[in-house]
């Protein structure tokens, strides 16, 4: 299959998917296993291999996908763990984890971790989480945000929090069988969508039923209010961690993409969802 590349689009003959930030500018942050902006020249991830603990930045191949050839050249037959997930928005809101035991996995004994044929980051549900220490500058009128993410939540993970800070600031809580409507704290309440369809009157239990299906899903969350992620002592924006670092709430899931836009810069939700689905072939 031939590749056609221009400054605005990464194209594989027969299957064109424009990087989302090309069409929908001014994102707050973006993390992905694909290139989100055709003009982005940085890396996707920084990876530690677990034999000699050497680290390397891994970028993208000519079609805008994660460069798995470079990734496996770095890890060889060893496993690889995420030290840093680079923000492609231009705002430098990189997500990091320097504690080796808490780094999620991208290579398992020489094989790239994948879901639906594309690389994914695996959070083990025990001690894995990543941190964005500047909280993305959320405050006041700039705190209203839409969140889009691609993940595969596991049915065996019955109680977790996807995004959390400290001092009981968090959102997207799921618990199997729970009728509790406390799905966020100081964050909304957000409206949840699965694969473009709204989840009406969400509870912790219905979110578990919707997302924890052992299948890849696209989640869209609108009307988030993120100002308390930028209020002392909540100075961190964490993936798979909340409640002051309580390990009991860490998630067991694969994550491939995580995008944020502020309310003042929001693209049309359906357009973003269509772009994501065109690339990942979720539904």
Predicted regions and their residues:
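Extracellular glycan-interaction surfaces
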Residues: 74-78, 83-127, 148-158, 164-167, ...
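Extended recognition patches within non-cytosolic domains
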Residues: 13, 257-283
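Short, low-complexity N-terminal tether/leader segments at secretion or assembly junctions of large
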Residues: 1-13
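Short, solvent-exposed loop/turn segments at the edges of secondary structure
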Residues: 40, 116, 144, 234, ...
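Extracellular glycan-interaction patches encoded by glycine-rich segments
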Residues: 230-256
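Short amphipathic beta-strand/extended segments with alternating polar/hydrophobic composition
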Residues: 53-64, 132-133, 173-174, 193-203
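N-terminal module-boundary/linker segments of secreted carbohydrate-active enzymes
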Residues: 11-50
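Low-complexity, highly charged intrinsically disordered N-terminal segments
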Residues: 37-84
């Amino acid at each position: 299959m031939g590749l056609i590349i221009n400054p605005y689009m990464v194209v594989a003959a027969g299957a064109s998917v424009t990087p989302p930030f090309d069409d929908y500018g001014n994102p707050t942050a973006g993390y992905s296993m694909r290139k989100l902006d055709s003009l982005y020249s940085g890396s996707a991830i920084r990876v530690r291999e677990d034999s000699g603990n050497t680290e390397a930045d891994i970028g993208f191949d000519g079609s805008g996908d994660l460069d798995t050839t470079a990734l496996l050249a770095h890890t060889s037959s060893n496993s690889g763990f995420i030290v840093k997930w680079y923000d492609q928005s231009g705002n430098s809101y990189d997500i990091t984890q320097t504690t080796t035991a808490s780094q999620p996995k991208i290579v398992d004994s020489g094989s790239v971790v994948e879901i639906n044929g594309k690389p994914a980051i695996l959070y083990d549900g025990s001690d894995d989480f990543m941190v964005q220490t500047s909280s993305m500058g959320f405050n006041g009128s700039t705190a209203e945000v839409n969140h889009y993410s691609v993940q595969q939540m596991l049915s065996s993970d019955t109680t977790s929090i996807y995004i959390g800070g400290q001092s009981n600031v968090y959102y997207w809580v799921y618990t199997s069988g729970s009728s509790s409507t406390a799905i966020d704290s100081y964050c909304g309440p957000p409206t949840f969508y699965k694969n473009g369809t709204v989840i009406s009157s969400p509870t912790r239990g219905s979110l578990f039923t919707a997302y924890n299906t052992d299948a890849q899903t696209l989640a869209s969350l609108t009307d988030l209010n993120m100002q308390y992620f930028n209020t002392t002592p909540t100075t961190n924006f964490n993936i798979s961690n909340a409640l002051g670092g309580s390990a009991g709430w860490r998630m067991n899931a694969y994550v491939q993409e995580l995008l944020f836009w502020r309310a003042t810069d929001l693209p049309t939700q359906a357009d973003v969802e269509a772009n994501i689905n065109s690339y990942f072939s979720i539904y």
